[in-house]
Regions:
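Metal-dependent polysaccharide deacetylase catalytic core of the NodB/CE4 family, i.e.
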Residues: 1-75, 80-96, 118-130, 162, ...
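Catalytic grooves of carbohydrate-active enzymes
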Residues: 26-27, 98-162
Length: 168
């Protein structure tokens, strides 16, 4: 949590992803609330802003928890997919993020090229690095190359929370 607090202090958005990385489609509302609350309390203990964004563990959208997320003040929830997100058209609790990791080839570049002024590409870097979970690992050199490409393309990179809290 010390490292997470450092990232928060650097301006990184800290979202909720549950305590146990459970399949949210298969648990009760009470159990889901306990999963959310654990992370919220940890954030509070470490002086991290309360999470307002959520990432569905494992990727699939869990329709059964969207109401709870809204009640708790979350503004968006992200799954995994290969599409852009248009906040004027798309549901903020069914955002599809493009995973970027060592095993996804050119998907990063293809996804960035699809972005427009009104349809955003949501990029998901699960771990840089994430050696205990090699299936979602992104080596630091690849991450740096991706960041350089975004800069070269004059891409504007913003946290998810800013898409949904502008003007509030």
């Amino acid at each position: 949590w010390r490292q997470i607090a450092e990232l928060s202090g650097m301006g990184f958005e800290i979202g909720n992803h549950t305590k146990s990385h459970c399949d949210c489609r298969k648990i009760s509302g009470q159990d889901f609330l306990a999963e959310l609350t654990y992370i919220e309390e940890k954030c509070r203990e470490h002086a991290i802003a309360p999470p307002r964004t959520f990432a569905y563990p494992g990727g699939p959208v869990a329709e059964n928890v969207i109401g709870i997320l809204k009640e708790r003040g979350y503004v968006t929830a992200r799954s995994c997919g290969d599409t852009t997100f248009d906040p004027q058209r798309d549901d903020p609790f069914r955002v599809m993020g493009v995973p970027v990791q060592d095993n996804t080839g050119n998907k990063f570049f293809e996804a960035v090229q699809r972005a427009t002024d009104s349809a955003y590409t949501v990029l998901v870097f699960h771990g840089v690095p994430d050696l205990p979970h090699p299936w979602v690992n992104t080596e630091p050199a690849r991450f740096e190359a991706c960041m350089e490409y975004l800069a070269e393309q004059n891409c504007r990179v913003i946290p998810m929370r800013e898409i949904f809290t502008a003007g509030q």
